[in-house]
Amino acid sequence: MELWYTEEQTQHVRLSFKVKEHLFSEQSEFQKVDVLDTYEFGKLMTLDGLVMVTEKDEFIYHDMIVHVPMAVNPNIKNVLIIGGGDGGTARELMRYQSIKHVDMVEIDKMVCDVARDYFPTISSELENPRVSLYYEDGVAFIKDKENKYDLIIIDSTDPVGPGEGLFSQEFYTNCFKALTEQGILVNQNESPVYEQFAREAIRANSKLKKIFPIVEVYQAQIPTYPSGYWLFGFASKSLHPVKDLKSSVWNQLNLNTKYYNTQLHVGAFALPSYVKEQIENGNV
């Protein structure tokens, strides 16, 4: 008998994976956490039935959420990750010796525990002494911070459930205050393909534009995320993601990334016409 896991991405679209084994299933204080071993994508973790990370394509997401801002400002020293419980974002940041410290705020301890147990190559830097891990609400954590971080990465779930507050204007305003003069904020920004996700991308972008002087959107192809086409937001107090790209400095680091490179960086900000229209006009 074959075992398949099916994720409902919209009311009319589903993505299915042939499963070798269901390795873990438990309800945390916040959400249902499952780990499945699949034939094509290796082990994957789901939160409330939605794919959060897979062994096969996680490098795409983590490369793009970390190396894009780091190539714009390779002098980043202090970083805040909100979410990121699988540890992939922390892993990529720890490749930079210039980074002094990372605060990582994950609301659900179970996500980190499961990542340590089942995804050791992704969670490998969670014990790094340069990483401080806080199991609390990122919305509350950021409230009293001022001029502290050079980079804030919002590596959150979708704007429902535990991640909902991470998409509010008040939260983005607090992030702005917490950033230094050349501070950068990066967030995952949903997909422009399906209407329900496109609306959230537009909302997040419009809120950021009310607060930050520089706001841009960039893209990546992530097979297991809804539609396979995903957007990220880049917001900064003073640095433009393309005009201020430090290609030569970043390339000298020889990080040997699997997805990201500085040519791709420039192209990632060249959006299809329909996506540009969605963002500029605020209509799906």
From Swiss-Prot:
The active site is at 155 (proton acceptor). CDD domains: AdoMet_MTases. It is found in: Cytoplasm. It holds the Pfam family Spermine_synt_N. GO terms for biological process: spermidine biosynthetic process. The keyword Transferase applies. GO terms for cellular component: cytosol. It is an enzyme of class 2 (transferase). Keywords: Cytoplasm, Polyamine biosynthesis, Spermidine biosynthesis, Transferase. Its main location: cytoplasm. The keyword Manganese does not apply. S-methyl-5'-thioadenosine binds at residues 31, 106, 137-138, 162. Catalyzes the irreversible transfer of a propylamine group from the amino donor S-adenosylmethioninamine (decarboxy-AdoMet) to putrescine (1,4-diaminobutane) to yield spermidine. Belongs to the spermidine/spermine synthase family. This is Polyamine aminopropyltransferase. The gene is speE.
